[in-house]
């Protein structure tokens, strides 16, 4: 049973998270970009906002988005699970997605992923004990000519990731957090 199908300790199904007025205002700005009868088109933007504010999209968060947009909860869950940019569980301060599609794999993507596993002391999909890093495989990031590539926090693309560049990246992120 996945965490999205989990129930509370009392056995009750998950309840939607309470959305703050600020969150509702941000949702409303996204919904306003679409015709009223197509407000569900804002689902990805609303999920991104929720993740920015809460760090991940929980089952309860999915329910809140579904209620806000008038969607079936399963339709929101399908979006959350289809796209790897949505974290369904808490992740580290720095989420590192290493491209594992064929062009990156042929140019060292697999070795880069292994190097990061060793350097961080985690398995693929794991989070470091200090909560600083989560390491995940990723789908094509659209930069095949720059392989191997990785993405930090779904926003910062890093290209041509040699062992030296991987070490510099980890050291730089640790230094940025004061954990050198």
What are these regions (language model features)?
Residues 1-180:
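Signature of N-terminal electron-transfer/Fe-S-associated modules in redox systems
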């Amino acid at each position: 049973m996945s965490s999205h199908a989990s129930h509370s300790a009392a056995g009750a199904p998950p309840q939607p998270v309470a959305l703050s007025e600020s969150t509702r205002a941000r949702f409303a700005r996204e919904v306003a970009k679409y015709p009223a009868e197509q407000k569900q088109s804002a689902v990805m933007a609303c999920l991104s906002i929720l993740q920015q504010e809460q760090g991940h999209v929980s089952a309860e968060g999915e329910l809140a988005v579904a209620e806000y947009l008038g969607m079936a909860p399963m339709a929101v869950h399908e979006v959350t699970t289809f796209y790897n940019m949505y974290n369904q569980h808490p992740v580290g301060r720095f989420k590192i997605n290493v491209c594992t599609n064929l062009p990156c794999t042929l140019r060292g993507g697999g070795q880069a992923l292994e190097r990061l596993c060793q350097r961080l002391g985690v398995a693929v999909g794991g989070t470091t004990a200090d909560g600083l890093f989560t390491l995940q495989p990723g789908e094509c990031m659209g930069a095949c000519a720059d392989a191997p590539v990785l993405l930090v926090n779904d926003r910062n693309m890093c290209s041509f990731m040699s062992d030296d560049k991987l070490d510099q990246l980890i050291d730089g992120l640790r230094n940025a957090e004061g954990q050198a």
